[in-house]
Amino acid sequence: MEIRWGEGKLARLPALADELVRLKVDVIVAVTSPAVLAARQATRTIPIVMPLSSDPVADGLVASLARPGGNITGLSVMSSELGQKRLQLLKESFPRLSRPVAVLWNPDYVGMAARYRQAQGGASSVGIGVRSVEVRDSRDLERELESMDHERPDALLILADPLTTSQRLRIVEFAAAARLPAMYERSGFVEAGGLMSYGPNVDQIVRRAAIYVDKILKGARPGDLPIEQPETFELVINLKSAKAQDIVIPQSILLQADKVIE
């Protein structure tokens, strides 16, 4: 097995993908959407399996979810109801929300625009507003967090990408210090001290990617393997963090939780 890591630097991905192609690997597993793009640019023949793509059709990676075509297949973490459900859980947990929820996201990251639009649509359905907070690097993040001290939202929704994931401790610490309820896409943020997350189990999805690799190594063509979307989602709540922030999570929400960190 050959492992290549871009160290969070997207500019490194094309060279790393080219290197794997020169090694004539049998399959490339590209974890993020930018990595998939780099791998596709490097080869149209070596099979590529993507465990955590956002919207591979909208991103131009595959022709359709049912029949991807080409040399790419795998799994998507997108689901049409996710944006609405996350905001619905926020509203049910904090019914006094009146100001727009600040959505922290990176518009330069592949697939993120679709996830922000999903949040916008979900907000309309739930009956609350959202405010776009765009962060492209750590300097943007610090500036926007500081601005929230002056233009305070009622809650946060954090969209996960390499930037927000690498800065999750900073984001979690800010939300705790400001006593801002925050919803995250990934449970790793909650395990780091965040309040709550709702989304697919990433560990399970990555394990599913291994099944795709196995099928391809046994002769299946990637273009014939449908893209899987998550069917089950987990609500994770950090009750320890809630108590530290003097936040009371309604019992009705706690009963829905798949995991409670105490």
Where does each model-flagged region fall?
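Short hydrophobic alpha-helices and adjacent helix-cap/hinge residues
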Residues: 1-262
